Amino acid sequence: MAQPIRIVPPSGPKQLYAVGEIPPLGHVPEKMYAWVIRKDRHGPPESSMQIEVVPTWPVGDDEVLVFVMAAGVNYNGVWAGLGQPISPHDVHKSPHHIAGSDASGVVWAIGSKVRRWKVGDEVVVHCNQDDGDDEDCNGGDPMLSPSQRIWGYETPDGSFAQFCRVQSRQLMPRPKHLTWEESASYTLTLATAYRMLFGHAPHTIKPGDHVLVWGASGGLGVFGVQLAAASGANAIGIISDNEKRDYVLGLGAKGVINRKDFKCWGQMPTVNTPEYNDWVKEARRFGKAIWDITGKRDVDIVFEHPGEATFPVSTLVAKRGGMVVFCAGTSGYNLTFDARYVWMRQKRIQGSHFAHLKQASAANQFVLDRRIDPCMSEVLPWIDIAKAHTMMWKNLHKPGNMAVLVNAQRPGLRSFEDVIEASGS
C-alpha cells in the first residue's frame, strides 16, 4: 500500500542555533548560547561561569556583531568570575556578564555608520573601547581617555558566546595563514607588549638595545621576546624552569636566566639592615648573570609584570636613564624599590595598559607579516571554557597563549568556508 505523501513546509531561519551550527550569513537570531557570569554566583570559574541562553546583542550605529569562531583565554575571565577586585556587574550594571577579551570571527551585522567593515569579513578583535568624544580620543592617546574600558571585562558583551558585540574600531584583519584558534589567542597580550616596548617615547625599543623580559615563556613574555628580536634588540628571557630554556631561545632570546638560581625576590628588606645587605649582594649576582649575556651592559628596558616579587630587582638592573615598564602585578601590588638607584641614575618607572587601535594594528601587522608567532599553547572545546579558566587560575596551563573554540567545530580550520564545510551546511 502506498504511503501518504507528507508535505514538509520549508524551514526558515531559526531564532536559536546550536553552537557550531551556521545561520544564513547576516541572519541574527533572537537568542544565543553564552557562558554567563552572574553576581550571585561569583567564585571559582567552574561555578561562576555557566552556559545560558540569552538575547543576542543589538548593535548601535558604530557597532558590529561578530559571529565568534574562537576566543582567547586570559585572566580577565578569572577575575570577572571571582568578582575580584570588584564585580564587573558593578561597572557595567548589566544583570549578566559574558567574559572574553580576545576573539576571531566573521562580521555578521553592522551599524548604520560603519564604513570600514562589511558582513562576511574575517576579523580579529582587540579589547580597547572608548566613547570617542573627548580630547584624548581625538588627537591624544585614547588609552588616557576617562571613558577607556576593556571589552569583555568592563563591558558585558565579551567573546565567550556565539555572537559578540564590539565597536567597529576594535576590528582588525585576521591573518589568513593562521587557524581560527590561533587568530583568537594573541591580540590582548601582543598589543599590551607592543605598547610597553613602543608606546612610551623616548624609551622605545631600538636595534641593539637590551631588554629584560620577565616570564619569558608566558602569554605576555613570549611577545616581549619576539618583538625585541624582530626589532633587532636583544631579549634576556627570565624563566622559572630550565625545561623552558630552549623554548625561549627558540623565540629569539639572546640568553636565558633561571630566576630560581637566585634568592632576591619579594619585597625589598629595609635599607641598611643585614637583610638588605644580603639582598643587594644577591641582586648584584643576578645583575652579573645579565652582564654575562650582554657583555657588561645594563638593560635599556625592563619588561615587568610580576610586580611585588621582582620590582626591587627590576629597578636595580635597569641602566642609567633606562626604563622599567610594567603592566600588571601578578605576584602582588605592593611594589618596593630603593629610590636612590632610581633618582640618582635617572631611571623611568612607567605604567602601561593595553593599547589603542594604531598600536594594536601595528602589533597585528607583525603577525600578518609572519614575523611574530602567536605561540598558542593549547586549544579547548566550547564545553570546556570554564575548565580553561580553572587551569589558568591554578597555573596548570602550558606556556604560551590558550584558546577555546566557539563556532569553529574543530581545531585546524582556516576560513569561513572551512567552517561551513565542517558544519555540513
What feature does the model see in each segment?
Residues 55-73, 85-138, 170, 175-177:
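Glycine-rich beta-strand-centered segment in the early N-terminal region that forms part
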Residues 79, 92, 101, 129-215, ...:
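NAD(P)H dinucleotide-binding glycine-rich loop of Rossmann-like/cofactor-binding domains
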Residues 192, 219-220, 309:
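Hydrophobic/small residue at the entry helix of a nucleotide-binding pocket
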Residues 206, 318-319:
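Helix-to-beta-strand junctions that scaffold the AdoMet/dcAdoMet cofactor pocket
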